[in-house]
Every structure is written in structure tokens, then in C-alpha cells.
Amino acid sequence: MAKKIVGYIKLQVPAGKANPSPPIGPALGQRGLNIMEFCKAFNAATQKMEVGLPVPVVITAYADKSFTFTMKTTPATVLIKKAAGVGKGSAKPHTDKIGRLTRKQMEEIAQIKMPDLTAADMDAAVRTIAGSARSMGIEVEGA
């Protein structure tokens, strides 16, 4: 018989920096899960990633106080800001342009995001990334 699922916990945790402080500690503690066990497992799973990049994670909590977790790819907005070299998006995205993204940079981001996107092919994924960039006030070249 399969384990009974008691809930899902969705968090964004910096790669390699999981610790028992909020938001991780309280979220896992409410379900009675071992916080340090998650932190060690998450940090081990993200050790090959760039430290500090936010990683969305979905933790499945079971009735016997055990858990599993699945990691998603880093949010597209974070990757776009990093590639464009800006700190945050424009306050007026369609009038004030704050950066520029080339087709090659968008293809690299789309390659990273491909497992989480619903795009059928690379060109559709690049168009999705281009749309996100435009809505942040970043100029898009060749899309």
C-alpha cells in the first residue's frame, strides 16, 4: 500500500543555503517533518548549482512523518535579470527599458527552463522567455 500523503509544501529556497530558520523551519515543523534532514538533503542535491540562486521546491509530506521533495528550475525572471545584468525589473516596463537580451542569451535560459515549460519546441520556449523579459522592461533582440 502506498503511503498516505498529508500535504504539499511549496517553497523557494536558495541553492545550498537551506537552514532551519524561517520560512523552512515553520513550514516543515507544522507537518512534524524533520527539518534538519530536509536541509541536509536539499543542500546535498543543490551543491552543483550556483549558491544562492532561488530553487522552487515541492515537499510531499506523508502520514508517517517522512517526506520527499522535487526541485523545479530557477524562476525565469531570476535568470533574465542575471543575464541582462539588472537588479530588478522596470517600474514602467513598456516605456522605460532597463536592459537588453540577445537571442543567444534567451536560448540559454530556455534550455535551462525547458523541463518546466509547456513549450513544444525550443523556438516556443524562447518566445516565452522573450515575453517574460519584455514584461520586465528588458529589450529583446531577434525574437
UniProtKB/Swiss-Prot annotation:
SUPFAM superfamilies: Ribosomal L11/L12e N-terminal domain, Ribosomal protein L11, C-terminal domain. GO terms for biological process: translation. The keyword rRNA-binding applies. It comes from the Bacteria. Keywords: Methylation, Ribonucleoprotein, Ribosomal protein, RNA-binding, rRNA-binding. The keyword Electron transport does not apply. One or more lysine residues are methylated. PROSITE patterns: RIBOSOMAL_L11. GO terms for cellular component: cytosolic large ribosomal subunit. Part of the ribosomal stalk of the 50S ribosomal subunit. Interacts with L10 and the large rRNA to form the base of the stalk. L10 forms an elongated spine to which L12 dimers bind in a sequential fashion forming a multimeric L10(L12)X complex. Forms part of the ribosomal stalk which helps the ribosome interact with GTP-bound translation factors. This is Large ribosomal subunit protein uL11. It comes from Nitrosospira multiformis (strain ATCC 25196 / NCIMB 11849 / C 71).
